[in-house]
Amino acid sequence: PALLRGAPRSPGAAVSLAPQPVVAITGATGFVGSHTLEAALAAGHAVRALTRRDQPPQAGVTWVRGDLADRAALGALVQGADVVIHIAGLTNTPDPAQFEAANVTGTAHVIAAMAAAGVRRLVFVSSLAARRPELSSYGASKARAEALVEASALDWTTVRPPAVYGPRDTDMLELFRAARWGLVPLPPGGATSIIHAADLAALLVVLAASTGALIARQTYEPDDGREGGWSHKELAQAIGRAVGRRRVLAPHLPRAVLAAAAAADRLARGDRAKLTPDRVGYMCHPNWVVRSDRRPPPALWGPRIAGEEGLMATAEWYRRERWL
């Protein structure tokens, strides 16, 4: 297929594939989590998934009703599991205190449930924002959650994704919609890495099924393989091409203007605002490119979806679902 670049990696001597595990997933009904659930099922795993709402029956999936604050539900989720992929968390809110409850306390509850059930293997989804916790409450909460994971007795691997895009994503959808009008306002100059949700999901499932020195107590920063990432203008133009625009106007806006826009978004959309003061804090940082020394080893995993093609396919999905 046009989107595939390279072939699936075969684990080397330092990584071995364990028997197909029972995988417990938090956040399985969200954007990244839903792709991860699909990847786990495609790999033949039995899945236990946490959900806040009733879900239709699905072959291979045991749904557990509850959330990260529900200790009984977390206990039921991890009971009998071989590995937990902890994805659930809060990425955006106008109330910074909510980051602490969801991302820090929620992670502590997952760790406690695993310890009580005797489950040792944890794949934890953090964020590249954790590299600079002083820039945002979100990044700070993810950094504190990472510290809890690292201080635990678990066999953990932490994954720090950059900007994640793909079908079912509602965050980058805003950029696609703006590009259709030919105008994509940008933060001050900088660069970012990106990764397709399907590639990220594939990595999480590989980590869940693997053992060995390459993954034990490691923190990885995966991306689409583009060296140096994407400048903000490059990404805006690529999204423009994906929606059929040969060129888009992509002005860099000063931080003060973005802060004013965040206030306006809060007035217009309330708690559903996408642009918040906290998000402005890390948007204005010039370097959200993954560190090359923290990319997952090629023997373990490599990206299969190149950015340009992935953005094109995502735009097509948005059109097909009438999101664009």
Question: Predicted segment positions?
Answer:
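SDR active-site strand-loop-helix element
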Residues: 26, 50, 84-88, 122-128, ...
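Substrate-positioning beta->alpha
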Residues: 109, 170-174, 188-210, 216-221, ...
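Mid/C-terminal beta-alpha module of Rossmann-like enzyme folds, strongest
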Residues: 210-274, 304-324
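Conserved beta-loop-beta element that borders a ligand/cofactor-binding pocket
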Residues: 147-167
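Conserved Rossmann-fold NAD(P)-dependent oxidoreductase catalytic core, especially the SDR/UDP-sugar
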Residues: 101-143, 157
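N-terminal Rossmann NAD(P)H-binding glycine-rich loop of SDR-like oxidoreductase domains
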Residues: 23-43
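NAD(P)H-binding glycine-rich loop region in Rossmannoid oxidoreductase-like domains
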Residues: 55, 65-105, 113, 128-132
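Short-chain dehydrogenase/reductase
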Residues: 100-104, 135-146, 169, 193-195, ...
